Regions:
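GNAT-family acyltransferases
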Residues: 1-90, 115, 152-164
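Loop/helix-junction capping segments adjacent to catalytic residues or to phosphate/diphosphate-binding pockets
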Residues: 11, 85, 102, 130-133
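Conserved acetyl-CoA-binding loop-helix of GNAT-fold acetyltransferases
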Residues: 92-95, 101-114, 134-138
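Conserved GNAT acetyl-CoA-binding A-motif
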Residues: 116-127
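Conserved catalytic-core motifs of GNAT/GCN5-like acyltransferases
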Residues: 124, 142-157
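Conserved active-site alpha-helix within GNAT-family acetyltransferase domains
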Residues: 128-145
Length: 164
């Protein structure tokens, strides 16, 4: 298993990942089913600060890959602003449906903590997502508070995660 920064050479395995995630009902991948390449290019561009929606900061995407299959994806958002600090956090991740419960998210978050982030970051999760809550807490996330996300229409848990 390896964790690598997303690039266009991952297109074929990314298409398979998008399909699996979309079939499982993951919203961000449902819309991308018809054009996985555009989503991959967009994510690669975001890492370089290209094509960012207003208020967004550069965001690098990394894939956890084993035997030519993407098991999970993690995004690390750079910088600080109110939206990152108070709403979505600096890190977002998901695991392929057929790889859930196997420690992939924990592996990715610990890897990012050791290899990518330079400073304290905020990580959030839906209050009902017990698996994500456990992942964050295993990585040393310190619970800060809960809040209602108007954008996502659900209650969110907010954590502080410090580098090693």
């Amino acid at each position: 298993m390896e964790i690598v920064k997303a690039n266009l050479s991952h297109l074929k395995v990314f298409e398979q990942y998008v399909e699996k995630c979309a079939q499982a009902g993951m919203e961000m991948y449902i819309a991308a089913q018809s054009d996985s390449e555009a989503l991959l290019k967009k994510r690669i561009g975001y890492a370089n600060g290209e094509g960012l929606p207003e208020g967004w900061t550069p965001s690098a995407t990394y894939f956890c890959i084993e035997d030519g299959v993407i098991l999970g994806s993690i995004r690390v958002r750079e910088g600080n602003n109110d939206y990152l600090e108070k709403v979505i956090g600096h890190i977002g991740y998901e695991t392929a449906p057929d790889a859930q419960g196997k420690g992939i998210a924990t592996t990715m978050l610990n890897w990012v903590k050791l290899k990518v982030i330079q400073d304290t970051v905020i990580v959030t999760c839906d209050v009902n997502n017990i698996a994500s809550r456990r992942v964050i807490e295993k990585a040393g996330g310190e619970f800060l508070n809960t809040f209602y996300s108007e954008q996502d229409q659900y209650e969110v848990r907010r954590y502080r995660l410090m580098t090693e």
